[in-house]
């Protein structure tokens, strides 16, 4: 209803005056309050006057009345009339008159999460203050606890809690005058989860009661960018949004990176996930502005300080650097320096200073002709170097996983060459091609020897891999065409032409018929993967394949599909060069490493794909080598490097180039009648005529040296019935080394997995106790 504007319907008009208008009722109330205040002030003056005048006693409304006119009573009255004073320095009372509506009051600081809660992980403890000291402090400068979000701390295992605390102390400079660290845990220990915890904690809180960083960058191989996004989503349950840079046009990428770099606070996606290649291309944008922290996954890519990726990352404006690498850090001093210098520049000085102080002395002591004094100095310098870098490096082995994962059986299988393989192998060794490689020592001859070694490895796998060389009558195969059958056809794979393929075919058939286990097949060559594919089609096995030709987006879908229990994929064919790092293939519990790599770290990365968090079944790892061949020589060199912690060979540099003439002569020797060249060179004292008479020591497992594994020249005592049956059926196995991950198997069936406290069943194949071993084990370490 519309109000009338008639004078009778309107309120009193505001008088024409410069004074503000006050309604009559408010005028009356205001006047009464003023009179009351004046009366109170007058009474207060009279009370004070009465107390000062001792001879005057007035009948006033005093707070405390007294009748006796004595000094004592007057003193008491004076004390009781005194106003209360708060016993705090610089205390200013506030009776409400100084408060202003809308101004935020100063409140006491509190940690984001309860530091005394059950299972709390406290990364920073503030100094302990007394209550009196705290009252005298500026409340805006009081430090608080830094406590990991219970969402994460409740699922972290003890070694992961230790790792998170170590990384936090390093990046915050609590362990020394540096802000970087290297997380060198072996595969499967949860490096990703530990980093997710660190990033989330730094983005959310700090001792100053505010976030420590406002954004972070995670750099990884392109195949793992999507995996990092999944890990953040999985563990934080969508509480943190990431910015994955994969695919997209150049314009969109530049726009997204510029927005990420320029925004300093309240960023919707505070974590950038980017590949090494993309970072190198757009380094100019990312290096313009500061960033809170950078994490480099698979950090062994940065062991060459001269490459462009290393230099681009060094230009990033951040002091907090974390490097992740499951590859064992061995004493290749140049790459060792590069890794440490990346996370903590100048910790070891310049490259020239490092070489003068450490590298020269250590390498001189490793020479075979070094003096006793040089060897002693090398030991001293090595210990000094370890003492420095141990401040920023943490490394735990996957022995920790034995508490949480099912048992793992690892087997090295020596398979016999077939008659065709044997003839091709010996003919090539006797050819003029190999003789010339052994006669020359120049660089050109070394490259030729490298090609010859690759040819021998292909003969060990299957004759199909060298069929083109045979038909073209290349050097070394001039007279080999008559070795192959007349009906030889490469389009129809014949497993009987290769000892390893025949064994693989038997074992896959037994696994398929025996249960619902899935299998991972790994090779260093895509040509071998082609043969795997032919075998799978021939036997009608469902399979998926991952190699360097597969796009990054498709890789994630392929892995997820294979891990799905409802999937019909039986085989996962994997190129170790394309996907040996970071993949989680827990859908399978059996893995075949079909051919060995010169670098033991590459094989270990590839073989760690199935024995990981989430695995519920016992795992079986099969490493296949051809008996007495070049593959056994490679295996021996792997073991030698691991046991003696010798120099690891750069991934981009062929190991064969470093061989001397004597080394090459050993590589090109072959004994067709030997069961295992590796076992012969061990000079094992636990075996008599290749039959084991004394078991390994009780405290050994599959991480121990091969000399401390079980040695089998027949199928008795094998931990795997599938292998034992295949040994009998195909008659192509000559020797087996095997061991397990732990002394007691953890059986994880569906019913136990569903329960909160699964019951552990004793291992039926438990090894009998043996007396302590003699000193021969130490001598065996020098067998290669």
From Swiss-Prot:
Boundaries of every Helicase C-terminal domain copy: 503-660
Modified residues (Phosphothreonine): 22
Biased composition (Basic and acidic residues): 36-47
Sequence positions that bind ATP: 185-192
Domain Helicase ATP-binding: 172-346
Region (Disordered): 1-54, 751-784
Chief localization: nucleus
Enzyme Commission identifier(s): 3.6.4.-
Modified sites of kind Phosphoserine: 20
Gene3D superfamilies, per the entry: P-loop containing nucleotide triphosphate hydrolases, SWI2/SNF2 ATPases, N-terminal domain, Tandem AAA-ATPase domain
GO CC, one annotated term: nucleus
Keywords: ATP-binding, Cell cycle, Cell division, DNA damage, DNA repair, DNA-binding, Helicase, Hydrolase, Meiosis, Mitosis, Nucleotide-binding, Nucleus, Phosphoprotein
Domain of life: Eukaryota
Short motif DEGH box, span: 297-300
A molecular function GO annotation: helicase activity
Feature: compositional bias, Acidic residues: 775-784
InterPro entries: Helicase_ATP-bd, Helicase_C-like, P-loop_NTPase, SNF2-like_sf, SNF2/RAD54-like_C, SNF2_N, SNF2_RAD54_helicase_repair
Region of interest called Required for chromatin remodeling, strand pairing activities and coupling of ATPase activity, as start-end residue ranges on this chain: 2-9
Primary enzyme class: hydrolase
Biological processes per GO annotation: cell division; chromatin remodeling; DNA synthesis involved in double-strand break repair via homologous recombination; double-strand break repair via homologous recombination; double-strand break repair via synthesis-dependent strand annealing; meiotic DNA repair synthesis; oocyte fate determination; oogenesis
Sequence similarity: Belongs to the SNF2/RAD54 helicase family.
Known partners and oligomeric status: Interacts (via N-terminus) with spn-A/Rad51.
Name assigned to this protein: DNA repair and recombination protein RAD54-like
Source organism (scientific name): Drosophila yakuba
